[in-house]
Amino acid sequence: MQERYQPNLVEAAAQQDWQARDAYLVHESAKNADGSEKPKFYACSMLPYPSGKLHMGHVRNYTINDMMARQLRMRGYNVLMPMGWDAFGMPAENAAIKSKVPPAKWTYDNIAYMKKQMKAMGLAIDWSREMCACDPAYYKWNQWLFLKMLEKGIAYRKTQVVNWDPVDQTVLANEQVIDGRGWRSGAPVEKREIPGYYLRITDYADELLDQVKNGLPGWPERVRVMQENWIGKSEGVRLAFPHDIKDENGQLIQDGKLFVFTTRADTVMGVTFCAVAPEHPLATLAARNNPALATFIEQCKLGGTTEAEIATREKEGIPTGLSVKHPLTGQAVDLWVGNYVLMSYGDGAVMGVPAHDERDFAFARKYGLTIRQVIAQEGKTYSDQAWQEWYGDKQTGRTINSGKYDGLSTAEAVDAIAADLNALGLGEKQTTYRLRDWGISRQRYWGTPIPIIHCQDCGPVPVPEQDLPVVLPDDLIPDGSGNPLAKNEAFLSCSCPACGKPARRETDTMDTFVDSSWYFMRYTSPGNDQAMVDKRNDYWMPMDQYIGGIEHAVLHLLYARFWTKVMRDLGMLKFDEPFTRLLCQGMVLNHIYSRRTPQGGIEYFWPEEVENIYDAKGAIVGARLKSDGSEITYGGVGTMSKSKNNGVDPQSLIDTLGADTARLFVMFASPPEQTLEWSDSGVDGANRFLRRLWALAYDRRAAVARGLASGYAWQDAPAPVKDLRRELYGLLKQAEYDYQRIQYNTVVSASMKMLNAIDNAQLPEGPAADAAIAEGLGLLLRVLYPVVPHVTWHIWRDLGYAAELGDLLDAPWPHVDEAALIADEIELMLQVNGKLRGAIRVAAQAAKEDIEKIAVAQEEVARFLEGRPPKRVIVVPGKLVNVVG
């Protein structure tokens, strides 16, 4: 064993050994030495986008996974930890435009570098199962399942309103529309209706909701609530406001009924206006002869269309000059166009009840509309001058100003009004969902081609199964002016599978969330070109532990659950939910430093470029540039980001201090599910600990060799040896518990205490001490191994443990020696008249009378009683003795 710890040599040696013997190659139905089958455990991190380099968030995520995999393997599990690449998507297209290389080359170059980084981290990944979303062998099955969904009616085609950039000739996501303009071209964005494919996730809404509420106990509560809210089940009434408004052809628009959905049918007698979305047919009709309305509608189209954007936007509207009829009274109700009404939600229309809806109240106050109270609460006075929370309460109020419905509770009024609407043919109770069908069509190049052929005679025709995959050309270079597939004749030109005539391929590609909705199952069935998954999937799935960021709580996790249920219904799976347990690791944070530029922008600085300014309490209050001493702004801590120059390059840290240092720091600095604040001093502390571990092993190598060979029996060990063993096994017991709770920071803390205990133990020389050191260091190495596998593997091998117990990768997890935890003596706090005055040591099984005698005989008792005899002695077993006098 070398005297000095050199992480580059230690880590290279360990990794070479692991690679040479395929240490992480996993097979189904692995056996124990006695022939019994090992229990399986599937632990998986959310697959990364190959952006170019790993960041510290990756390091944290994968180290959590790796610790779990290694410790469970020691406990006898057959553990699967795979890895793949979420390789399709816009960043590759944007990089291709900038660098003028095909997205495929950019993507595969990045994968090669990031894979090298992962191996440098020492991750226990079975690379034989690697998948890549842009590999035709993978996305073939996206296309295959899409066709199956099309057959079952789960996939269907309809028109959709999109953000269209007329300069770049492409569709933009809502997030790419900034102040009504394209994020790249700066051109005013247009709203266009184009056809696209959708998946009926709404058919699974009830099952998705029920299981996230009642069937996923291993998921964080906040994620379950987020999914519940996203699905957004609402029970209410869908009712119609009749009208006689006709289009230019004399046809009643939408057959003369304006439908709305409400969860507050009890307030229908308080309706004073209705509002429709800017895209609603009634709005379009009214705008033809109303220039102000037409202008307003165009302005609405420039904004984003997400619910989040609409929720924060100032609520504005304009009257159409049209009216509809109240379904129960027949009175005219003015019709408005509102910028807060979504065409994609419900029927694209809402009823306005200003008295009992805060948004409607503000809208009515702004435009001087009537506010009619129809719900009252005993002892409270209503005023239409300012909103009060009780106006919207539906638990305790009673109806007023509602004719025959007066005096009813909310539930009673809803039932009565729904019954009357139903009798009139103008409404019924209905359950709706916030969840919308999943639109998967993207007018992008770098994605899975949708396997559809367009024929002038036959229309859209599915690609025959035997012709899959429809292969994406991987040599195209986007130029920013639309989808390059639409200009590539070699891809476009084909024959219609139905009639054989010349036809054109679909140029839309699939949403990249399709790729990530089932990749974790492909890991279980690698190399199968005949089926999406096979019987090996039944062995590994459902996944035991999924690990990833909270930002994926809704879309990815919801789509993966939906995809699983579709595969189940197609007879491919035997389970309902893909992920038994979910851990959402916290973000990695670092300090942010910036200043305003003369042009009004913000310039960010790397932490190493500045010196902090501290207040009297040691808190950072500002910073100075090291280069010229000028003061800059300290912005606190925030998520590591390239744009804010506060990221830390894992590769630089690995190259200088080693992967084990990086792993140890990110595991020790914070519990896995909480945010982690970066600390250079914390990194240095982690490295010092590893050097101290190495030094201890080197210094005690001879004692370990003697101890391993001694076969010492512990019953006759001297007291200091027994004390050390008791402390170490107590720490082992705590560490084992913390491993099971995934509280890895306290596992590291226990390891540090174990090191201190061994290093500071005052043991008499001899066989007992040697055996205790050998045993203790062996315990420490096994507890630490999942955290820092390289250095522990090296020490384990060099000190001879491997020869005795086998390679550390498969060394058994140590059992707690319960006998070692039993103390011969215990320490009791000594009190005199209730005040702590010292401590005494007594035999663990000492009788109460013996404890009293030892306590009374102490010098401190005589001194504090000032010669008075004790009146009584109180013994609290195992804790204290109190002499009263």
From Swiss-Prot:
Keywords: Aminoacyl-tRNA synthetase, ATP-binding, Cytoplasm, Ligase, Nucleotide-binding, Protein biosynthesis
Superkingdom: Bacteria
Reactions this protein catalyses: tRNA(Leu) + L-leucine + ATP = L-leucyl-tRNA(Leu) + AMP + diphosphate
PANTHER family per UniProt: LEUCINE--TRNA LIGASE, MITOCHONDRIAL (PTHR43740:SF2), LEUCYL-TRNA SYNTHETASE (PTHR43740)
Keyword NADP: no
Binding site for ATP: K642
Molecular function, one GO term: leucine-tRNA ligase activity
Major localization class: cytoplasm
EC top class, as a word: ligase
Organism of derivation: Bordetella avium (strain 197N)
Listed CDD domains: Anticodon_Ia_Leu_BEm (cd07958), LeuRS_core (cd00812)
NCBIfam families: leuS_bact
GO terms for biological process, alphabetical: leucyl-tRNA aminoacylation
GO cellular component, one term: cytosol
Keyword Secreted included in the entry's annotation: no
'HIGH' region, short sequence motif: residues: 48-58
Motif placement: 'KMSKS' region: 639-643
Compartments reported by the entry: Cytoplasm
Pfam families reported for this sequence: Anticodon_1, tRNA-synt_1, tRNA-synt_1_2, tRNA-synt_1g
EC number: 6.1.1.4
Family: Belongs to the class-I aminoacyl-tRNA synthetase family.
Protein name (Swiss-Prot/TrEMBL): Leucine--tRNA ligase
